[in-house]
């Protein structure tokens, strides 16, 4: 059994590729079924966010394993293998465990130490449990990663400063608009990222917010908290002209805001500028919008420069966190190896007990037939001894014939010989 982590993220692939490799919530069950149907896969978890798509797998080692999994991923998304291969990373066993722990702790995020990723990893794990069989080692790896993430956040200052994609989007808005108290902000979506954006905006005295979402109930709960108006996605075209700032983060597989929609809004605004921050993957705003005069479009990748300015104080904490991850990953792999030994011990004990039971049954039968008790006990002891030492004796003889002193010493140690 081998543990694997493979995928792409914001460091290895541009948004144009990442959006083609995402797994939407609507198709996740189907994707998991397809993945677990692969003969080498024993268990799997799919993590798909704005900044990464990753597969965490428990697999049986086989020839061309990497090729088979890349082929599955490309076939599922109708991708050219060469396009994906150049951006794909592949981690195995200890490296896979360390990678997941780093991801869950926010150490591999676009925003170092951001807390949202832990919730996303937990959701990915929970989704994989719904009607899908998972390998126990994979489950244990995820549970351990959750506790490591908690330890990192508790024992270091990795989360001391409020830095996130949501925070960066608000920082960008403050850089472009002198005061946010007089602007109207349209938020598209009502997920966790938009919730954070809305709270940041409220803290910076934004008075007018509009939340557009597919389901009104979820949006209304957020609107009640921050004092916003709620509209449906179909109302965006009519209301876009009211917005000075648009920040969008949905799970839609297709763009929600098109070039024509923005052109009409700009015309109604008499070309007053609009800031559009698209932090969704796949993108919510057609890239062509950025070519329009007075429409200033930023994608999630464009936020990197803003985010970089807020990371200095987290670097020392990240070093401490990496030490924790290294230690915990090593302990997990020791546990995993011990599980393999435990299975061997169980098999050895079971085999010994079978030999004991077989010979004891024969001895009792001989006693019941009136045989000499002393002779029967001596015979039992002799046969039991020979049966138990037969396999180790053969191994010792073979090691001696091979001149394998290291194996001989291991066998001597295993048998408790001085």
Swiss-Prot record:
Biological processes per GO annotation: protoporphyrinogen IX biosynthetic process from glutamate
Binding site for substrate: 49-52, 109, 114-116, 120
Known partners and oligomeric status: Homodimer.
Keyword entries, A-Z: NADP, Oxidoreductase, Porphyrin biosynthesis
Catalytic activity: (S)-4-amino-5-oxopentanoate + tRNA(Glu) + NADP(+) = L-glutamyl-tRNA(Glu) + NADPH + H(+)
Organism of derivation: Salmonella choleraesuis (strain SC-B67)
Listed PANTHER family: GLUTAMYL-TRNA REDUCTASE
Pathway(s) the chain acts in: Porphyrin-containing compound metabolism; protoporphyrin-IX biosynthesis; 5-aminolevulinate from L-glutamyl-tRNA(Glu): step 1/2
Designated name of the protein: Glutamyl-tRNA reductase
Amino acids binding NADP(+): 189-194
Entry annotated with the keyword Transmembrane helix: no
